[in-house]
Amino acid sequence: NWMVTRINATLETKQPRQYFIGVLDIAGFEIFDFNSFEQLCINFTNEKLQQFLNHHMFVLEQEEYKKEGIEWTFIDLGMDLQACIDLIEKPMGIMSILEEECMFPKATDMTFKAKLYDNHLGKSNNFQKPRNIKGKPEAHFALIHYAGTVDYNILGWLQKNKDPLNETVVALYQKSSLKLLSNLFANYAGADAPVEKGKGKAKKGSSFQTVSALHRENLNKLMTNLRSTHPHFVRCIIPNETKSPGVIDNPLVMHQLRCNGVLEGIRICRKGFPNRILYGDFRQRYRILNPAAIPEGQFIDSRKGAEKLLSSLDIDHNQYKFGHTKVFFKAGLLGLLEEMRDERLSRIITRIQAQSRGVLSRMEYKKLLERRDSLLIIQWNIRAFMGVKNWPWMKLYFKIKPLLKSAETEKEMATMKEEFARVKEALEKSEARRKELEEKTVSLLQEKNDLQLQVQAEQDNLADAEERCDQLIKNKIQLEAKVKEMNERLEDEEEMNAELTAKKRKLEDECSELKRDIDDLELTLAKVEKEKHATENKVKNLTEEMAGLDEIIAKLTKKKKALQEAHQQALDDLQAEEDKVNTLTKAKVKLEQQVDDLEGSLEQEKKVRMDLERAKRKLEGDLKLTQESIMDLENDKQQLDERLKKKDFELNALNARIEDEQALGSQLQKKLKELQARIEELEEELEAERTARAKVEKLRSDLSRELEEISERLEEAGGATSVQIEMNKKREAEFQ
């Protein structure tokens, strides 16, 4: 984990990111003969990712059918992996018990196994006791994963979960002469390193974080990122286990397809509608297949247009369904529509090319005909002239003709010149008028085309605005439903929060009561210890006093030789029992009196001995009772300490859960506010669209009036330039 943190810190660019493309490459389920802690982490990750894939590909796919109003019978694929995931990650699950065991210094792998069996064996269907087979590694428990049953060996799990760094090795690296190595460990703070004031708690808490906790935290972050993206899934299939080229192991491939959920995906694709397109996009892209199905010049709703277009095509009408906002296709139909569209485009382009080539060829042929006619006329005239050029009468005609009617010819020439001048002037005026009318006609036609384009654009804008309006209304309905759902979820979360708060208060009260009981027991224990110390002091004092009495008795025994043996036996008995005596105050007084009266008689000595033995037995019984009560109190204290630790652990878990619930509640409230703001924005946009639509309608009516006026002006100007207009119409027809 330390190495992963260092690598991430080195690769981090600290630049703002808004969009990203991520590639997640992970090994699949690992089922070996010997499976340890690493395999559990990898298989747990695969369980989460497989659940995400199943939810995204199967559950969300069928939920979209229901949301869009498609008639669909829900297919339960039976691939809910939540039971196995809860067994691993939930409180009192495998990882939770492993983290709890890492806190206790006397915990071992076997105590971890015992707790697993106590909590889950026979209570969870996914947790089983393995059968150890001779010749294979020992297994301590088995889990039923999505890909199969995996036997796990738990030896060394506690040490792996703690993942400690050796302090001595780290200190050696920090003092290394290699600059890179010393920089890597420069910021590492070990257990013996000085901690700044106010930061010690955070350092200590973070250093105790286990590998399983970090793995779960990173996995939760990964799943959050995946849920915020549009994922695409790629499955890798191993063809054979021998790595041989061109060899496919059919059972192995089918097993992988079944484990990966590919077979279920194929079932959904065959029965469902994997391809979908918005109505507007479908109408715009596939209208070319049958333009007559959607008439020009009138507004038709996108859904109705798509329905008319699909009903007019020669396809299987059971292969598609209409939703609220999209049209859904079965697998293969969209590819067929694409082929039909490509074929239609190919025919249209071929026809355009043929017409263009025909027009060019006809123009070239017309030029050839005109050239041929001109050449024939010129040749005929030249041949006729050459035939009469040398005829005598023609020569005479050429000589006499200029002399005849010369005066009349001159008058005619003058008249013709005047007429030519008038005609030329009239022609120039007519040409000028014609050019003026042509320019005016061209400008009017240009205005007409511009107005038609503008009207068409406004009609398209109006159609788009109506589509957007319908879409906004649908979005508003969906958002209102989401807001209602969020409100219900928020109420449920508030109720859960209130219940958790009540539980927390109850646990706090129990904890305070337990603390008071512990305080009382500690006070009682302190009192008992004080009494014990006082008793020991009394015993010591009595021992010293009895030593003095021994000296006195020794002096008296010289005078009482007859009683020496009995007296010495009594002293030996007292010396043997002096370590166990606690309270001998009464015995001391009686003993002093008996010592003073010892010279009296032997009977008094025997009486003293009997009293001492009775007091000794009483003190031994009291001492034994006191020791037993002390042991009971210590056991009670240890049990209360264990209960207190357990309650503290549960309280911390509840506090963390309450904080998560509060954070989720705040996020839901924030999202609710964002949705309300979005609804207000959509309502404002809807109002703006309505205003723009009214303006477009008004502009459309104004343009229609202007177009009618222009048409009237064109009709008025058409009387003077009817011939020119006909020519212009012919030109327009040719260009069209």
Swiss-Prot record:
MF annotations from Gene Ontology: actin filament binding; ATP binding; calmodulin binding; microfilament motor activity
GO terms (BP aspect): adult heart development; cardiac muscle contraction; muscle filament sliding; sarcomere organization
Annotated GO CC locations: myofibril; myosin filament; myosin II complex; sarcomere
Region (Disordered): 716-736
UniProt entry keywords in alphabetical sequence: Actin-binding, ATP-binding, Calmodulin-binding, Coiled coil, Cytoplasm, Motor protein, Muscle protein, Myosin, Nucleotide-binding, Phosphoprotein, Thick filament
Pfam family, one: Myosin_head
Domain notes: Limited proteolysis of myosin heavy chain produces 1 light meromyosin (LMM) and 1 heavy meromyosin (HMM). HMM can be further cleaved into 2 globular subfragments (S1) and 1 rod-shaped subfragment (S2).
Name used for this protein in its record: Myosin-7
Organism: Oryctolagus cuniculus
